Curated annotation (Swiss-Prot):
Keywords: Dioxygenase, Iron, Metal-binding, Oxidoreductase. Belongs to the iron/ascorbate-dependent oxidoreductase family. Residues 281-378 form the Fe2OG dioxygenase domain. 2-oxoglutarate-dependent dioxygenase involved in glucosinolates biosynthesis. Catalyzes the conversion of methylsulfinylalkyl glucosinolates to alkenyl glucosinolates. Fe cation binds at H301, D303, H358. GO terms for molecular function: dioxygenase activity; metal ion binding. This is 2-oxoglutarate-dependent dioxygenase AOP2. Its cofactor is Fe(2+).
Length: 432
């Protein structure tokens, strides 16, 4: 058993004196930046989400996922795989675009209850909860941009993004269930084709970690993802999932630098994994055999969007990989939310913030895990470019500007499917 002391930083974002320009704001802003540089994520304490609202969103998810499959399948979107997803009843999710806007949520509930006016109570609960997650996201994004001296771009940046919400349900596989394998989850991830999932099945990776570019696979091959997979299989499956749009971030001396902040993940789903894991807040995370891998509700990955704000309620499951390749098992506590940086933030900040590898590993027998998350997504027709203020001799530019749609096409090309670190292959500056 490893150390029990590892845990994510806990930052209070609900302090009554936490106002922009105040000394408390500067203090918390510094803590947020350090947490994102060191871990790529942190636990946010935010008691502005009442316990009553937390219970309401849980009951809402239970009610939604209890609907017949044919009803849930009405949750559709013009983009494939953005709506309802189900894989062998091991996990399923529902998707809502701009869930902080009541009109959009009403459209969602009307899909499920088309012969009435939707479900007013469910719509209102989702809206209220989404609004609180958006509050956290906006506060953190403002702090990050201020901390790097690019606060003059904040307003344009905030206007350039939109939100996608996912309500998720995970069921722990029964002990000894030989029918549930990593291949099952890889197949699921391939079907999550529009949420930015990029699984690499059976790959053999052993990569180093950089101090400055800590976990951006596009910057440093395998940063934060030291996976030893001795399977002899080198056929990589790269599937991007676009719960994404594009975001316009005005950065860099009058240049309307464009950024892709799409929701997506870069997944390493390895058969016969030898994962050297570390202990976490309370428990060691051991994943040295196939039985442990069967518990994965979502294999190891990095998000591709800007930020994810996650609520996992009472049942744990989220695990985050540290710089030194140890796993932190994040234990839920009241009024806390997990803020996770994505690959797009790494690119936007020129590698100064890391996007952590993380996974979902459900271990509690016969207990269903419900989570809700807001993903900060880009609006259409923009590309990523780090602002000039973040590029200097010590921090040379790591990425060429790129349009998300072109990157997405590359992901699905024959060449893209053969490359593990697709973003790096597509747009990394060669001198970096």
């Amino acid at each position: 058993m490893g150390s029990c002391s590892l845990q994510l930083p806990l930052i209070n974002l609900a302090d009554k004196t936490l106002e922009p320009g105040s000394s408390k704001w500067a203090e918390v802003r510094s803590d947020v930046r350090k947490a994102l540089q060191d871990f790529g994520c942190f636990e946010a304490s935010y008691d502005k989400v009442s316990l009553e609202l937390q219970e309401s969103i849980m009951k809402t998810m239970e009610e939604l996922f209890a609907l017949p499959v044919e009803t849930k399948q009405r949750n559709v979107c013009p983009k494939p795989y953005v709506g309802y997803l189900n894989h062998n009843n091991l996990s399923e999710s529902l998707g809502i675009s701009n869930a902080n806007i009541l009109e959009n949520i009403n459209e969602f509930t009307q899909q499920l209850w088309p012969h009435g006016d939707g479900n007013e109570n469910i719509s209102k609960t989702i809206q209220l909860f989404a609004e609180k997650l958006v509050e956290i996201d906006v506060m953190v994004r403002r702090m990050v941009m201020e901390s790097f001296g690019i606060e003059k771009y904040i307003d344009d940046h905030l206007k350039s993004t939109e939100y996608r919400m996912r309500l998720m349900k995970y069921i722990a596989p029964p002990e000894g269930d030989a029918n549930t394998t990593v291949d099952d989850y890889a197949d699921l991830l391939a079907k999550l084709n529009i949420d930015g999932v990029e699984p690499n099945v059976g790959v053999k990776v052993n990569a180093d970690i950089s101090d400055d570019v800590n976990a951006n696979p596009s910057v440093n091959a395998g940063v934060g993802a030291n996976v030893n997979a001795d399977t002899g299989v080198n056929d990589n499956l790269n599937v991007d999932a676009e719960a994404n749009g594009d975001a316009n971030i005005a950065v860099g001396g009058g240049v309307n630098a464009n950024t892709d902040l799409g929701v997506g993940v870069n997944v390493n789903s390895n058969v016969a994994v030898n994962a050297k894991t570390g202990a976490t807040s309370g428990d060691d995370v051991e994943a040295n055999d196939d039985n442990e891998e069967k518990k994965l509700g979502l294999p190891c990955h990095t998000d591709k969007n800007l930020f994810t704000v996650l609520f996992q309620h009472e049942i744990e499951g989220l695990e985050v990989k540290t710089k030194d390749e140890k796993w932190i098992r994040v234990k839920p506590s009241p009024n806390t939310f997990i803020v996770i940086a994505g690959d797009s933030l790494c690119a936007l900040m020129n590698g100064r913030i890391r996007a952590p590898y993380h996974r979902v590993r459900v271990t509690e027998k016969k207990r269903t895990r419900y989570t809700a998350a807001i993903f900060t997504c880009p609006k259409p027709d923009y590309v990523i470019e780090a602002p000039k203020e973040l590029v200097d001799e010590k921090h040379p530019r790591l990425f060429r500007p790129f349009d998300y749609r072109d990157l997405f096409t590359f992901y699905h090309s024959e060449a893209g499917r053969k490359i593990q670190y697709t973003l790096q292959a597509y747009c990394a500056v060669s001198e970096a």
